[in-house]
Amino acid sequence: MQAYRGWVALGAFVGLAAVIAAAAAAHGADPAAARARAAGAQMLGWHALAIVAVGLWGTQGGWLGHVAGALFTLGLALFCAAVYSPTLGGPSLGMTAPAGGLLLMAGWAAFGLSALLR
């Protein structure tokens, strides 16, 4: 089995972002913003592990493994943008968080299928 280093590296950097986000949530935010930021940090952390897993699954995952990684990445970007924007003084992004959540769910489905179909 050959790992995909790009997915592993991306997952590691998303994990770094999760730690930074958790630190930001713990320091200096009002309670509501801190809860929102902590939720974003938690999503980053769990999905960092998922992206690393996609990379380690490597060639065994086939094209569905890459689809899962892409869905995790795009879903995180949308979800976290919607969570963090209002807590940092930006606009509310409406349905962006649910769209990101749906993409994350689709990523998990693609990842599971990549295992079942191999």
Regions found by a protein language model. Give the residues of each.
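Polytopic transmembrane helical bundles with strong interfacial aromatic enrichment
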Residues: 1-118
